[in-house]
Structures are given as structure tokens and as C-alpha cells.
From Swiss-Prot:
Keywords: Cell membrane, Lectin, Membrane. One of its GO terms (molecular function) is D-mannose binding. The jacalin-type lectin domain has strong affinity for high-mannose glycans with terminal non-reducing ends of Man(alpha-1,2)Man or Man(alpha-1,3)Man. It is found in: Cell membrane. Induction: Up-regulated in the presence of organophosphate pesticides and zinc. This is Aerolysin-like protein. PANTHER family: AEROLYSIN-LIKE PROTEIN-RELATED (PTHR34007:SF1). CDD domains: Jacalin_like (cd09302), PFM_Dln1-like (cd20221). The keyword Cell membrane applies. The gene is aep1. Residues 4-143 form the Jacalin-type lectin domain. One of its GO terms (biological process) is defense response to bacterium. Pore-forming protein which might play a role in host defense. Exists as an antiparallel dimer in solution. Can also assemble into an octameric pore-like structure spanning the cell membrane. Oligomerization may be triggered by binding of the jacalin-type lectin domain to high-mannose cell-surface proteoglycans, and also requires a low pH environment. In vitro, shows high binding affinity for S.cerevisiae mannan and human HIV virus glycoprotein gp120.
Amino acid sequence: MTYPTNLEIIGGQGGSSFSFTGENNGASLEKIWVWVGGWQIKAVRAWLSDGRDETFGVPSGSHQEYVFTPGECFTSLSLWGNGAGTRLGAIKFKTNKGGEFFAHMTSWGLKTEYPMDVGSGYCLGIVGRGGSDIDCMGFMFLNAVQSTVLTNVNYPTINQLIPKVATEEIKSVSFENKTSVKQEQKVETSKKVIKTSSWSMTKSFSSTFSVEVSAGIPEIAEVSTGFSISFGVESTHSLEQTDEKNETLTTTVEVPPKKKVDVHITIGRASFDLPYTGTVKITCKNGSVLQYETKGQYKGVAYTDIKVNTVEKDL
């Protein structure tokens, strides 16, 4: 049986069990404080990227601190027991940003070092047992990752959304027909449009993994009653995506005899800022999958089709 996470615990069997991880929401270890005693690790306080923090053991005296930056992962981790099989004795790790941390008991010497498998290096939090001290503890890691996809994306408030569309004139031209025969005039125009889409995600996660999004993107269309919102077909996008293209239009305008026709060519631009819900599916290289529900904010810019308006007047 393969698992998406890796956890090895070092120390004794006393105390009460604790588990403080982002296993259910992808949150990672953001900051850690460690208090040490003569023959044990006294206490640990951990912060996760979802805003939670907890303290285990009983702090005493000064502490050592390590703060992780977004995208900072473990490259190595070693743990020691206290040599008597009753407590955690030391924590030592290095990161991909050149960071180093070493907290150890102060009176008893270190004996057996236990190097840990850090997997992808992305630390989901800590698990162990504690009471007045840290009896035992380990760090939970996400195993090496093959792919990360945001899927099952929904926009719960989209049906309540009243589209705000800014209409931009691309071209304005007039044709006069002073003859007694109907004339046809060709009109051509083009407009460079930049469509954008982004789905918010915690900085620690999006800085570490390349996330694909499998989703339909909100689109805007002009209808007889104004504007309506629809979804494009579900396809694969990056977490932040920009699509640049030239929208072109070629049309023929009929100008009746003794008439003037004013032609106005416009396009509508809509900005979206709305909540989304979805599922993050992390597939590890060992074939296992970690999946959890998530939510965030979608921001995007979409355009309507180019529209041609004509106004006919007598000469």
C-alpha cells in the first residue's frame, strides 16, 4: 500500500497524542518555535499556512525559531531521541533556500541520529505525543509529487452576478449613397484583446507546486436583454493565465439609394471577481493521491463578440 504522505516519529510512548497538519487542506508548516531542556525537547509551537497555530508540551525559558518563506521546503531532516527512549531529544533540518535549524537538549549528549525521508520537502505539519514535554514527534511530508490539479471548479454566486460590461468603440465610419442604386460597402476591423484568468491559492502551495486548473471559464455574451454569463467548455489552464489574440471582423454594409449609413463597431469588456470552490488532487510519483476540498477567489477579464451597429439616415 502506498501513501501520499510520509511520517516517522521518534521518542517515547508517554503523553497524549497530537496531530497538527494540513493533510485535509494542503496547509504547510510556516513557522516553528522549539524550547529545549537538559534531557529533552520541552515544547514545540507550530504555525500552518492556513492561519492555525498550536503549542505542544510546556514552554519554559527562551525558544529557537524558524520561519519558512513561500516555496521553502525541507531538503533534509534528522531527529534524535533523548537516549533513554522516553523523550524527543533534538531536531535538525536544512531547506532549499539555504536555511538551517538545530535545536537539541542541553545536558545529555546526542546518541543515535535518525535521518528522515522528506519526500517532496513540503511539510504538512507535526504529529506526536506530549504532556509536560515532547514525548515523541515527527514531521509529516507530502511524498514526491507527479502532478497537482485543481478540478471540480464551481462558482457558487455566478447566477446572482449582474455583469458589469464596459463597451469600447473599435471603429466608426459613415457611407453615403447619392445614386439611385443600392450599394454594398465592405468594413474590416481588428482589435487585440487580452483575456486573463486566475484562481487564488495559498502562496506556500502555489510557490512550491505547478498547479493545473481543469475548469470552465466564465464568459460574457450580449443578448437581447443585455448581457449574460456562460461557461466555456472545461479545459486545462495554468493557475494564472493570460491569452492574447486579435479579434477580427469583416462584414458588408448595405447602403440604400439616397441614404447615409453610420457604422459603429464595438466590443464589451467584463471583469469578474467571484468566489470559487473546487477539489485539489495531488498525485504522487508512487501512484497515491491526496485530495481535499478548497475555495478561493477567481478573477478574470472576458470580452464579448465584436458587434456592428448601423444607423440609416436620409441624405
